[in-house]
Amino acid sequence: MCAFLYPDEYLDSTYSIDFDQLYKEGYRGIIFDIDNTLVPHGAPADERAISLFTHLKELGFHCMLLSNNKEPRVKMFNDAVHVNYIYKAGKPKPAGYRKAMAVLGTDTSNTIFVGDQIFTDVCGANLAGIRTILVKPIHPKEEIQIVLKRRLEAIVLLFYRLHCKIVKPKYQSARK
């Protein structure tokens, strides 16, 4: 399997990430996918998402939403969390991730990407040189093209679980 498809970490939920520890390690920018990463597909920001972004801002993180959706969808979510966003990002192309870092004032050494899809989120962030955290999708209801991709992702995750320590070593802490 290709290492660029493997995340640096694979966790149950965005909400189980230890963001306090990541800040202590020197990370300052977090780029998020929205649908099935922060809320179910198409949903507005809920209390849990709003609380998360409030906490991240209090810690000192610069946050960005990076989505392939059109602006009305991204803006609907962002109206409650008030962070920077890029819509129609063209993931997995690395240009959107690089633009996000430029807006945030961060670089590959102190930026993290959190998303729920391997072929768009993880692949693009890896190509841009950003630490990746893959999370399990929040809700099983998805569009048909994503359902088909999930079957291929299951194969990648099988190889990841079997070989990730050999293929891709644990990511080093960010420089301060």
What are these regions (language model features)?
Residues 2-32, 42-43, 47-61, 66-176:
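Asp-based, Mg2+/Mn2+-dependent phosphohydrolase catalytic module
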